Design a protein with these regions (language model features):
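Short basic helix-loop element that most often maps to the first helix and adjoining turn
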Residues: 6-25, 49
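Conserved hydrophobic/aromatic packing and binding residues within compact polymer-binding modules
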Residues: 8, 22-23, 33-36, 61
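Recognition helix of helix-turn-helix/homeodomain-like DNA-binding domains
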Residues: 27-42
Length: 66
């Protein structure tokens, strides 16, 4: 698991969302959310939207800051 995957899964779980909930919010499939949390990086527009949704920086999601 990558740092991005770990942080995305952590944020989703601590906010109480299922993968399906997040997929609906982001306008993507549940499979996309699963992939982000396991082996695939989100595309830049999705990364930015995820950061805004969770109110964290993209640097945090990328593992550049704590």
């Amino acid at each position: 698991m990558t740092i991005i995957s770990e942080r995305l899964q952590y944020l989703r779980l601590t906010h109480g969302y299922t993968q399906t909930d997040l997929a609906r919010t982001m306008g993507v499939s549940r499979r996309a959310v699963y992939a982000w949390e396991h082996d695939k990086y989100p595309e830049i527009p999705h990364l930015i939207r995820l950061a805004q949704f969770y109110q964290v920086s993209t640097d945090y999601l990328l593992g550049l800051t704590e």
